[in-house]
Amino acid sequence: GSDIHRYALLGPYVPGTVWGHEFSGEVVAVGKNVTKVKVGQKVTACPALYCGKCDSCKKAKFAQCENLGVIGQHHQGAFAEYIVMEEENVVPVPENVSYDAAAMVEPSCVVAHGYYKVNLDPGDTVAVVGCGTIGLLAIQWAKIFGASKVIAIDIDDAKLELAKKLGADETINSRNKEPFEEVHKVNGGKGVDVAVESAGTPITSAQTFSLADKGGRVLFVGIPYGDVMVKRLYFEKIVRNELKVYGSWNAISAPFPGKEWTSTVHFISNGQLKMDPLITHRLPLSKGVEA
């Protein structure tokens, strides 16, 4: 998704650069100074490239690096048979984790990064707006963090059915029902503790403000590629309900690449994060354009 939308359409894509920033593979060669990564290891890798020199990097806030790069942007990406990565970006993967699942580690880390920012607590109620890959991972992560109730919101019944299988306690089709009213109906007349926007559309970005309870938290992990027009009622919720609004970008923290990566690999390995249901097609590299 973001390879096309972010880098090619709106981002700083350099013509001739190979796309792809979510991947897994086997190490086939290492440099002479590499000590922690071995030939033959199954791995994935963090695609983010921080500069290490700006004020944010000096504070170990790598996700806020002023010169942050990503493979597939200015640097050759992973839609290829081989890719070269720095040792510190490489994340080993246990043998019981498939290559398919390992390729999904990065988007899972995006979700984990956001939840670590909002300090999701056991017993919290959570609404997830948008049940694409990020949203379905957000539902699973909410349960891992101990959420007492997870409400999935989308306009696609098939996605909502999958959300239910992956842990959502309630589902709402926002094409047919008003999310604000339905969330309050299924949550005891209240908003949720944490409202997550993962659809990345102007409409859902505006709606999400209305779903959080008084003093609640609103987490944005989706990026709307258009202007967001917020209704007065929704915007007033921020002020009158003293909401805390969090933007979450990327999937890295200190020590680099961050606990998002180690925790994701752990929960995939023990079966709490399920990746196979999110995979719909498997195509060879030769059919990359078709994909």
Question: What are the functions of these language-model segments?
Answer:
Residues 217, 232-277:
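Rossmann-fold dehydrogenase core element
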Residues 177, 206-210, 214, 259-291:
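C-terminal hydrophobic helical "lid"/dimerization subdomain
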